[in-house]
A protein has these predicted regions:
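Helix-boundary/low-complexity linker signature
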Residues: 1-196
Length: 196
């Protein structure tokens, strides 16, 4: 697992880069905090899962528990001091289903109202758990590169039609993905090479 850690780091970098276009969707600093926390928590769950050899079901359960614990602090932190945990949790839970449609019908940037940050939090948390788990445990670790690619596609499709510097956004995502695939393939070749 330790030998695969640099590759997992590159996948996390690629996921972070794929999230850059989400800024133009939400336009709030709260997005940066929410996605950073989702990325780090997802990576921690995947790393502990690889270390302890958790099953897919246990990994998924831990992801759901993390999402439930983080939903209010990440989507509606302003409601915590007022003691509105239960209504905020209900809004965040409803946003699991409703945020996707609302993102398509509200003018950009959408901000943080109605727990709309739940959509990217779910994508980044689940995507990080899947990608880092694949990077650390799978025989076909290259498959982890699909996660940041899909996140970038989602961000571009849901984002504005006139995304600033789209070539830079693509480059930010492609470079770490390419580096990751290269590292994985070189490690595989070294492991198959005859020992002298």
């Amino acid at each position: 697992m330790i030998a695969r850690a640099p590759g997992a780091g590159l996948v996390m970098l690629a996921i972070a880069a794929a999230c850059v276009p989400m800024w133009w969707i939400f336009g709030t600093p709260q997005l940066v905090v929410a996605l950073a926390v989702a990325l780090l928590v997802g990576a921690a769950i995947a790393a502990v899962g690889a270390w302890r050899r958790w099953s897919k079901a246990l990994l998924a359960t831990m992801g759901v528990v993390a999402l439930a614990l983080l939903a209010v602090p990440l989507t509606a932190p302003q409601r915590i001091p007022r003691g509105e945990w239960l209504p905020a949790f209900a809004d965040a839970s409803a946003a699991l289903v409703l945020a996707w449609r609302r993102l398509l019908t509200i003018g950009l940037p959408v901000g943080t109202g109605d727990s709309l940050l739940m959509a990217p939090i779910v994508l980044v948390l689940a995507g990080t758990i899947v990608a880092v788990t694949l990077a650390l445990r799978s025989r076909r670790a290259e498959a982890a590169a699909l996660v940041p690619a899909l996140l970038a596609i989602w961000a571009i499709l849901w984002g504005p039609a006139d995304l600033p510097a789209p070539w830079l956004t693509g480059l930010l995502t492609i470079v770490p993905i390419t580096a990751y695939v290269t590292v994985v393939r070189q490690a595989r070749r070294r492991s198959r090479a005859p020992r002298a």
